[in-house]
UniProtKB/Swiss-Prot annotation:
This is Tyrosine-protein phosphatase non-receptor type 21. It catalyses: O-phospho-L-tyrosyl-[protein] + H2O = L-tyrosyl-[protein] + phosphate. Substrate binds at residues 1068, 1109-1115, 1153. Residues 395-421 have a biased composition (Polar residues). The modification Phosphoserine is found at residues 577, 589-590, 637, 673, 710-711, 798, 800, 805. Particularly abundantly in adrenal glands. Residues 897-1168 form the Tyrosine-protein phosphatase domain. InterPro entries: Band_41_domain (IPR019749), FERM/acyl-CoA-bd_prot_sf (IPR014352), FERM_2 (IPR035963), FERM_central (IPR019748), FERM_CS (IPR019747), FERM_domain (IPR000299), FERM_N (IPR018979), FERM_PH-like_C (IPR018980). The active site is at 1109 (phosphocysteine intermediate). It comes from Rattus norvegicus.
Length: 1175
């Protein structure tokens, strides 16, 4: 039919998808294969990287990224946070993207996943062959021999070594010399024979270890010019930023810890050095290059700093926190190079699982029908007689030596789990990888054949455990992670032999191989070799089928499958789960205090997006808690009886466990009027309820993840623990499930008879507090070898208990960039950088040295029963320094410091006294939404247009010792938007000394905005509102720095001198080791205070000392408490640390935030007494 107006349209039988709706990303892998992914045009580089990681079943994607060639034919790394298509359209020479290593590690033994090491090996080999990593001829031949062994296997598998002529042996720059190539091939052939017997992973490891010792390893450079105009190459390496001169001058390396800041301006890239107070500039080709170099160097700086602090605590952390999987394991020798996941990226975190992934699956019936529960049993490697391990590899008899090293716990994705991802050559059923020809079988990330091919081979009887053809290596689908990986909603459960009738004969004889499908609700009653095999291109849920018939035809499998959308690349999740606690301990699931204080290091990825998981977890735990199976054998669970074996004689006997919740409550009053103070009025009649004003602890599972860490000593006592636990479980139910709430006893306090006084808010003193002022202190002095039969271990308040009201995101969008608090948003630690468990419990030998109370406190437990009155020992005013020192040391050794600390209220009993701080307009002025000043103790500013309530997160703290008044202001580290308020407070309160107890940035996280100008910089003056700040001088004294500042009021012209004393030796985790250095810092504060008091105006003879850290409670409290207690020692006053701390916390909540900080105060006082004896 002709068209009107003579229009003619081209007729075709095809249509094209609009380029505006999708993007076909073509990515070249490190083995030179290409994969294509269909993505949205808005898909970021991160999503593309995750797609590659899914294809490779790679979890440790932190080290990898994507790059492309720009229009100047230069390599440029993709910005993972921006859409990939826009970057390629704007900058790329071609649409091809390349996968590679962006962050190099100091030691390749720290890479945990086998696929990670293999990809890392391919990257290093590519760097050598392409000439990016310079090497000598001897080094190239040595590496070539290892590469041939890794890629081709033993030399005796081939008739001759002629194939080496076609193999790329040497770097590309030497390929033109044929004579050199021939000689090199002969030497490589000899090396190939020498390396006979090495498996592919072993040869690859030797190759990588050889490369990491070469000059230029991990370097990436760019051309630039220095300040003299000389041509240089600048780039990042493992140690820092290097500068190589092309005129023969030796290279210069600016180490990461010496670099304070990096910036770029136009075409200039600048480094600010921390120790020299100077800035070094380099000129790049253009503005885009300067910005790119800055972005790359900043990323590497953060990566290596985070990993440096991780490596320092890795051994202790992995020995404690990672053992929260309610399992026993032996950690591998090399410690992983773990990086905490960046919070802004979903999956770009390296979540280290440094233990063997051997799993005995248990199928506990549940109501939802979707998720099974499995137990990880790590006291042995998961191997059956055919040499199959959990990652899907089949090892021959002479290659099982590699199984001695525990394999990392993987959560790989299937070969293609997205319907929009088309197949490629990798997905072909007849595809056989050509890069490995050794006895080592390719792991599960190698391509797998389809169902048809597998069944044909099965019918031909080709499956034998000792066969090694490439087609047979891929048959191990039943035990491969592509089909047995846990998704995000699979939780571990105890190893319960609840279905013995379902086990196969093989699993009956060899209980370490149950042949259970990870996702199916019923185990396969058949060996792995006889199971049906599902095609490779599928989602993981394709094996989540309940198969109980004798035969397993494929159509039945597909027909009964409930299809769901493919899950994203799995979140790194902690190995433990809360239902374990509900099952083993019969404790209410709302008691997160059973966790160790450093559990947040384990659950750093438990963020808001995983809250639905926790709610569904509560539902799962209900039928588990209700179950009563006395005959079940529970291995690797953390039992109450088994836990107390590690308490050095501190046991819970059956008569103790039968106590009800009422038995926990009241402490008795003695004749000496010594008493205890409860959080609220305790009901004496055994009731299960608390008063309305009670300081209770009730959180749902969406607030915290519960972990209990077993001790290694439990291994030898496993059977006894199980039997004792089976008897005591019903008794524990009555003791622990009372209204899901617990009373938390606070510290008893000393009489106010001495000259030590606290200015307390009159209107907020409760009855228990008034009674507390007329009683004597009770200090726990307990012999470690005597078992406590009448004390019931109860959960104690941990550092995670800031407030329950703090668990919410800020109301405004601008607050989303800043967490409510570090621990609440899922970051590494608590507000003050809570140290990992290893900071207190470093080795097994150290754990044996500590007493029962200390060990109990470290595990979040404390005795609710106070010792008898004669057990207490007061540090009297008449005691000599030697006697005081001895008493303090005795408290530390016997562990009474820990129970003493746990009894101190973290904040006032009555909540809601921070109304001004909780106003919506003041939310942006709080660094953390759960650390707020009380209304009657807060520092009030003169209201301004910008701050009409005159609010700042700061508190007055007033103490009187021997008639001398000590006045402090405790505040948080200034934010960028509160610097003006900070300096207004300094001016209005007449502050002359600022004591800063933190660095500006620790571990890549901002602790305090730099509110004063640098000395020696071009701009040594900064203006905040009406105040102009100028740096006059700076003196570095080792562990602290003294800076003189001039503060000028621009409206009146008045000037003042402000002293800035910054303690620079506080580690990111724990407390300072140099006690003398900290005491010298306190002496510097005293010295400057005396100087300022002597020169101050008469109207302000004693200006307050302003102390701040990050949140203004942890380290700030340590400084204030230490200085007050030192003053008590100097004036020979009663030394009552817990009472002083409790009264300090009545003026600002949660001062001295962690147990280690409280212990540090004791150590400071002991060191002060020892030093005073020498004077």
């Amino acid at each position: 039919m002709p068209l009107p107006f003579g229009l003619k349209l081209k007729r075709t039988r095809r249509y094209t998808v609009s380029s505006k709706s999708c993007l076909v990303a073509r990515i070249q892998l490190l083995n030179n294969e290409f994969v294509e992914f269909t993505l949205s045009v808005e898909s970021t580089g991160q999503e593309s990287l995750e797609a590659v990681a899914q294809r490779l079943e790679l979890r440790e994607i932190t080290y990898f990224s994507l790059w492309y060639y720009n229009k100047q034919n230069q390599r440029r790394w993709v910005d993972l946070e921006k859409p990939l298509k826009k970057q390629l359209d704007k900058h790329a020479l071609e649409p091809t993207v390349y996968f590679g290593v962006v962050f190099y590690v100091p030691s390749v033994s720290q890479l945990q996943q086998e696929i990670t090491r293999y990809q890392y090996y391919l990257q290093l080999k590519k760097d050598v062959l392409e000439g990016n990593l310079p090497c000598t001829l001897e080094q190239a031949i040595q590496l070539a021999g290892l590469a041939v062994q890794a890629d081709f296997g033993d030399f005796d598998q081939y008739e001759s070594q002629d194939f080496l002529q076609k193999f790329a042996l040497l770097p590309v720059g030497w390929l033109q010399d044929e004579k050199l190539l021939e000689e090199a091939a002969q030497k490589v052939a000899l090396l190939h024979q020498k390396y006979r017997g090495l498996t592919a992973p072993e040869a690859e490891m030797l190759y990588m270890q050889e490369v990491e010792r070469m000059d230029g390893y991990g370097e990436e450079s760019y051309p630039a010019k220095d300040s003299q105009g000389s041509d240089i190459s600048i780039g990042a390496c493992l140690d820092g930023i290097f500068v190589k001169h092309k005129n023969g001058r030796p290279p210069v390396v600016f180490r990461w810890h010496d670099i304070a800041n990096m910036s770029h301006n136009k075409s200039f890239f600048a480094l600010e050095l921390a120790n020299k107070e100077e800035t070094i500039q380099f000129q790049t080709e253009d503005m885009e290059t300067a910005k790119y170099v800055w972005r790359l160097c900043v990323a590497r700086h953060k990566f290596y700093r985070l990993n440096q602090c991780n490596l320092q605590t890795q051994a202790a952390t992995l020995n404690s926190v990672r053992r929260g999987s309610s399992s026993r394991m032996s950690l591998p020798k090399p410690q992983p190079y773990a990086m905490p996941p960046p919070p802004q990226l979903h999956y770009n975190g390296h979540y280290t699982e440094p233990f063997a992934s051997s799993q005995d699956n248990v199928f506990v019936p549940n109501k939802n029908g979707f998720y099974c529960h499995s137990q990880t049993s790590l006291d042995r490697t998961q191997i059956d007689l055919s040499g199959r391990i959990r990652n899907g590899s089949v090892y021959s008899a002479h290659s099982t030596n590699s199984l001695n090293t525990p394999q990392p716990y993987l959560q790989p994705s299937p070969m293609s789990s997205n319907p929009s991802i088309p197949g490629s050559d990798v997905m072909r059923p007849d595809y056989i990888p050509s890069h490995r020809h050794s006895a080592l079988i390719p792991p599960s990330y190698r391509p797998t054949p389809d169902y048809e091919s597998v069944m044909k081979r099965l019918n031909r009887g080709m499956v034998h455990a000792d066969r090694h053809s490439h087609s047979l290596r891929n048959l191990n689908i039943g035990s491969s992670y592509a089909y047995s990986r846990p998704d995000a909603l699979v939780y571990s459960q105890p190893e319960i032999r609840e279905h013995p009738h379902l086990a196969s004969p093989q699993s009956a004889h060899y209980p370490f191989n149950l042949n259970y499908s990870f996702h199916s609700q019923a185990p396969y009653p058949y060996p792995v070799e006889r199971r049906p095999v599902v095609g490779a291109v599928s989602v993981p849920e394709l094996t989540n089928v309940q198969l109980q018939a004798q035969d397993y035809p494929a159509p039945n499998i597909m027909r009964t499958q409930v299809y769901r959308p493919p899950p994203p690349y799995p979140y790194p999740r902690p190995a433990n789960s809360t239902p374990d606690l509900s099952r083993h301990l019969y404790i209410s699931s709302s008691n997160p205090d059973l966790i160790t204080r450093r559990v947040h290091h384990s659950v750093q990825t438990f963020q808001e997006d995983s809250l639905p998981v926790a709610h569904s977890l509560q539902e799962v735990s209900e039928p588990l808690t209700a179950a009563r199976h006395a005959h079940l054998q529970k291995r690797n669970s953390i039992e109450i009886a088994g836990l107390t074996h590690g308490f050095e004689g501190l046991r819970l006997k059956e008569e103790t466990m039968s106590a009800s919740a009422a038995d926990v409550a009241p402490r008795t009053f003695s004749a000496g009027s010594q008493s205890s103070v409860f959080s609220d009025k305790v009901k004496q009649e055994g009731t299960e309820e608390q008063g309305s004003g009670g300081y209770s602890h009730k959180k749902s599972l969406s607030d915290a993840t519960m972990l209990i860490h077993s001790s290694e000593e439990d291994e030898d006592l496993e059977d006894d623990s199980s039997r004792e636990h089976a008897v005591s479980e019903p008794r524990l139910t009555a003791a622990f499930s009372q209204e899901q709430q617990l009373n938390y006893p606070c510290a008893s306090v000393t009489p106010v008879t001495g000259p030590l006084h606290i200015f307390e808010p009159k209107s907020h003193v409760t009855e228990p507090e008034k009674r507390a002022k007329d009683i004597s202190p009770v200090h726990l002095v307990m012999e470690t070898h005597q078992p406590r039969r009448h004390g019931l271990l109860t959960p104690s308040m941990s550092e995670s208990d800031l407030t329950t009201s703090g668990r919410y995101r800020a109301r405004r969008d601008s607050l989303k960039k800043r967490p409510v608090s570090d621990l609440l948003s899922g970051k590494k630690n608590t507000v003050e950088g809570l140290p990992p468990l290893g900071g207190m419990k470093k080795t097994r030998a150290d754990a044996k040295k500590i007493g029962p109370l200390k060990l109990a406190a470290l595990n979040g437990l404390s005795l609710s029963r106070l010792p008898l009155p004669d057990e207490g020992k007061e540090v009297s005013t008449r005691a000599t320094n030697d006697e005081r020192c001895k008493v303090l040391e005795q408290r530390l050794e016997q562990g009474t410091v820990f129970t003493e600390y746990e009894r101190i209220l973290k904040k006032r009993l009555v909540d809601g006294e921070c109304s001004t701080a909780r106003l919506p307009e003041n939310a942006e002025r709080n660094r953390f939404q759960d650390v707020l000043p009380y209304d009657d103790a807060r520092v009030e500013l003169v209201p301004t247009k910008e701050n009409n309530t005159g609010y700042i997160n700061a508190s007055h703290i007033k103490v009187s010792v021997s008639g001398i008044e000590w006045d402090y202001i405790a505040t948080q580290g200034p934010l960028q938007n509160t610097c003006q308020d900070f300096w207004q407070m300094v001016w209005e309160q007449g502050v002359a000394i600022i004591a800063m107890v933190t660095a500006e940035e620790e571990g890549g996280r901002e602790k305090s905005f730099r509110y004063w100008p640098r000395l020696g910089s071009r701009h040594n003056t900064v203006t905040y509102g009406r105040f102009k700040i100028t740096t006059r001088f700076r003196t570095d004294s080792g562990c602290y720095a003294t800076t003189g500042l001039k503060m000028k009021h621009l409206l009146t012209g008045q000037e003042r001198t402000v002293w800035h004393l910054q303690y620079t030796d506080w580690p990111e985790h724990g407390c300072p080791e140099d006690l003398k250095g900290f005491l010298s810092y306190l002496e510097e504060i005293q010295s400057v205070r005396r100087h300022t008091n002597s020169t101050s105006e008469p109207r302000s003879p004693n200006p307050p000392l302003l102390v701040h850290c990050s949140a203004g409670v942890g380290r700030t409290g340590v400084v204030i408490l230490s200085e007050i207690m030192v003053a008590c020692l100097e004036h020979n006053e009663v030394l009552d640390i817990p009472r002083v701390l409790e009264l300090l916390r009545q003026q600002r909540m949660m001062l001295v935030q962690t147990l280690s900080q409280y212990t540090f105060v004791y150590r400071v006082l002991i060191q002060f007494l020892k030093s005073s004896r020498l004077i």
